[in-house]
Amino acid sequence: MAKELFLEIGTEEIPAGFLPKAMADMEGLIRKELESARIGFGEVKTMATPRRLALVVKNVSAQQTDAEITTMGPAKKVAFNDDGTTTKAGEGFARGQGVDASALSIIATEKGEYVAVTKKEIGVATAGLLAEILPRLINNIPFKKSMRWGDQEVRFARPMHWIVALFDGTVIPFAFGNVQSGSMSRGHRFMANTSFPVRDFGHYLEECERHFVIPDPAKRKEIISREIERVAKAAGGNVLPDEGLLEQVTYLVEYPSAVHGTFSAEFLAVPKEVLITSMREHQRYFSLVDDKGKLLPGFITINNTLTEDPSVVVKGNEMVLRARLSDARFFFEEDKKVPLEKRVEALKSVLYQAKLGTSYEKMERFRTLAEGLAEQLQPPLKAKVFQAATLCKADLVTGMVGEFPEVQGIMGREYALLQGVDAEVARAIAEHYLPNQAGGELPASDTGAFVSIADKVDTICGCFSVGLIPSGSADPYALRRAALGIINIILAKGYNLPLIPLVTKAIGQLEGRLTRKKEEVLADVLDFFKGRFINLLTDRFPADVVEAVVAVSFDNLVEATAKIEALAQFKKRDDFEPLAVAFKRVCNIVKEQVTVPVDDKLFQDAAEGTLFQSFKSASSMVEEKVVQREYLAALTQIASLKGAVDDFFDKVMVMAEDEGVRNNRLALLQEIKSLFRDIADFGKLTA
């Protein structure tokens, strides 16, 4: 009979950022544990608030399923004599398994025949297994940081106060540290700080709401969304959409309520990004805008309690925000007194990275790269690119960015505009940080794009040059994001920009700082880009198609992407599979480079001449289509060789006894192979 499993872990306040991952980890762990224990189960749901993590599993089997367990023993020749009697080794294995030697069976493996014992294991009651599974699950939930409390040896994100563990309404007894499992949960810390009994999951939800706790984050998020829209409308404005803040606030409260506050309109003279950042990052406030998107002097904050007099809460929030915005206004007014170009020199005293020099030195390096990109792709922009690259890090030494690091680049743009800098240059100052998150906004201007690419390439090459290479989940310099940003900019803009010369130039500028060989750095950086490119493209195209193209064509990302698109289309056609088979036949024979040219005077069979003429005809067409980036048309031309290739293999013995004839035939096949490889390595494609 199926039953319900319910677990709640009650704690001190866990950081909001820990909770979504903890929920996902709990679900994965319980699924793995139940499957490993041969316990059937149905739907799994996890929930979290700052003070509790919970999960419910529906339709859990009351008993573990039976299983046949096979234990391998020694080799047959070790366990049995030639006459079939059991050796001491065989008898010892049987005795160790608790069976008679007659129960030994023979199993054939890749390494030979071995003896084995197969025993039926009768499933036990699930409840007893859960007493071992649940404390192990709790212990295995991974957190960025965990702690001990009191004199306990166990660790968790925050000190634990209670555990509810029920199976079919009955307590699963176990202890985690000094906390014993039971059936008693607790209400809201300030509004209902009492214990209450739990019978099952449905009862738990009812009792939580009676005690001012909404355990389900999806429901809390819905309430918050509804509340902030209601309060914003009452205040005569609209909520500035901020999904990240909404997600964060959802995990900061157990029982949300929204209140509206205001700030002096005089603060609106400060750039809106600073005001929004201050409210969002430091206070977790939602900003308000009018119907045209203009920032209003108001905010909405989410409380974790219901209050009889919200004005008291509002006044406290307004007072804190006023101090923050006063600081911002002060920094803004002071910063405006010094032109950005005069701040550039100050970058000489700002350390970028101990092994890579100052921010000024970094700026000089990527400015040269950016100029080169402009020269190559948009020569008229060279002067603007030079100016944007020179100024784009200058706001790092302003008071505003020192206080609010999140507005770097944005403040550079604002100060540049106030000081009469060209609008496109000012825009590029902000854009060079883009994209600043996965899937984020890309630079709109070419000026911003060139500086962004150059800055990121210098960062990646610099770090790789001194051994600061990402490993596992560790990527302190956000190099993966930088590489993806470069790739996305190049693809979005359609830049005809080979990577190898750009990366080579960037590494060359690091002369004197390299702690590794240039050749090693170049190879590693290109592999790094290749990995990011493959990951990005396999989200859109079949993995084998991406691998096949990247194996032969990666330097120019726009070209490689176009080839991938064409090959993905071509693979759906009826003539794809026969063509792939033909290519593999060619590759199976031409495994080493042949250095002799094709000589048609050495042909001995008409099929050789036919294939050679077909190749020459197709080759010129393929070359033309490749230059025009019409890769689907190029593939169609390559496909026209299929008949001639098949006829060649049917009628011609490639490995002829005559060395000259043999090498000539191999050279012909090598030409065919190279034609295929203008697009992709067909050998990597699956049917």
UniProtKB/Swiss-Prot annotation:
Pfam families registered for this protein in UniProt: DALR_1, tRNA_synt_2f
InterPro entries per UniProt: DALR_anticod-bd (IPR008909), Gly-tRNA-synth_bsu (IPR015944), Gly-tRNA-synth_heterodimer (IPR006194)
A GO cellular component annotation in the UniProt record: cytosol
One annotated GO molecular function: glycine-tRNA ligase activity
Subcellular location: Cytoplasm
UniProt keyword terms in alphabetical order: Aminoacyl-tRNA synthetase, ATP-binding, Cytoplasm, Ligase, Nucleotide-binding, Protein biosynthesis
PROSITE patterns associated with the record: AA_TRNA_LIGASE_II_GLYAB
Example GO biological process: glycyl-tRNA aminoacylation
Keyword set includes Phosphoprotein: no
EC number(s) stated in the UniProt entry for this protein: 6.1.1.14
Superkingdom, taxonomy of origin: Bacteria
PANTHER family registered for this protein in UniProt: GLYCINE--TRNA LIGASE, CHLOROPLASTIC_MITOCHONDRIAL 2, GLYCYL-TRNA SYNTHETASE
Similarity annotation: Belongs to the class-II aminoacyl-tRNA synthetase family.
HAMAP family for this protein: Gly_tRNA_synth_beta
Listed NCBIfam families: glyS
Description of how the protein assembles with itself and partners: Tetramer of two alpha and two beta subunits.
Protein name (record): Glycine--tRNA ligase beta subunit
Organism expressing this protein natively: Geotalea daltonii (strain DSM 22248 / JCM 15807 / FRC-32)
